Amino acid sequence: TEVAQAQLIAIVKDGALIESAGKGDKVQLIVNQTPFYGESGGQVGDIGNIRFENGEANIVDTKRSVGVFVHFAEINSGILSVNEAVELEVEGLRRSSVRANHSATHLLHEALRNKLGNHVAQRGSLNAADRLRFDFSHSKALTKDELVAVQSSVNFYIRQNTEVSTRVMSPDDARKLGATALFGEKYGEEVRVVSMGYQQKSGKGLDGNGYSLELCGGTHVKRTGDIGAFLILSDGASSSGVRRIEALTGEAALDHLAKQQNYLTEIALELKTSLFDILSKVKSLTAERKSLVNELSQLRKDMALAEVAGESDELKSEDLSGVNFLV
């Protein structure tokens, strides 16, 4: 849900509890129930707004601390008081983008494990509205072919458009289903398992045909097709033995591809060639430039030798006290 009625339990300003806050105040709000997701597990916190009897406030971030959701707010109008009834509303479009990036991260994790090996494990992540970042254990850079294969795999399961399901169970039951746990995470008596994708006879899931199963408390799309598209931007070293992939999904991925297309079209026009002949044209121009540089270098050497030879021809001999000198 993205909208909820609640009661304001506490207001914090500059580290101290206060009874009320007015226009312009930057405060932290705690309510008895909330539709907002608090930053955790690599997923950013929700933003949105909170409305009350005589005013409203923007929620610019949400964090979770010891099970308590803290809403970082800026009061736009009115006076907000403790125990007041409020209505909270999450910014839906932003949450949708975050959900898409989080679900794509799960598909990316599984694609990397399938392509590179089971040594691949998550070492960190960021699931924001505009991009995703995924750190994983691997000792060397991915080749161009590996990156293409991983990206293609993620897009395959996006197009598969399977339902994304969540189930709460014991950690032991989750392990029996083949769910992946995050390195270093501590789990309680119950865990939430998020599954997506169909892979025949994978041995994962209730029917043994699951693709990605992970222990996760974050928000996700309803179907993998809701992700839209997946585009890898870069693969680099995060630290020793850890690689980092940055990627885009949905409209952001399509916009990036459109910009690339426009840029390549401009280059092709400048080079007076087609899009698919740009590389051969650049290689030809590079070879031509190298040849010209070599010719110019040789010409300069020849000119220098000619100058030396010319100076030698102009040398004259003079006799001083019976000794010949070249001048």
Where are these regions (language model features)?
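A glycine- and charged-residue-rich anion-binding loop/surface
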Residues: T1-V327
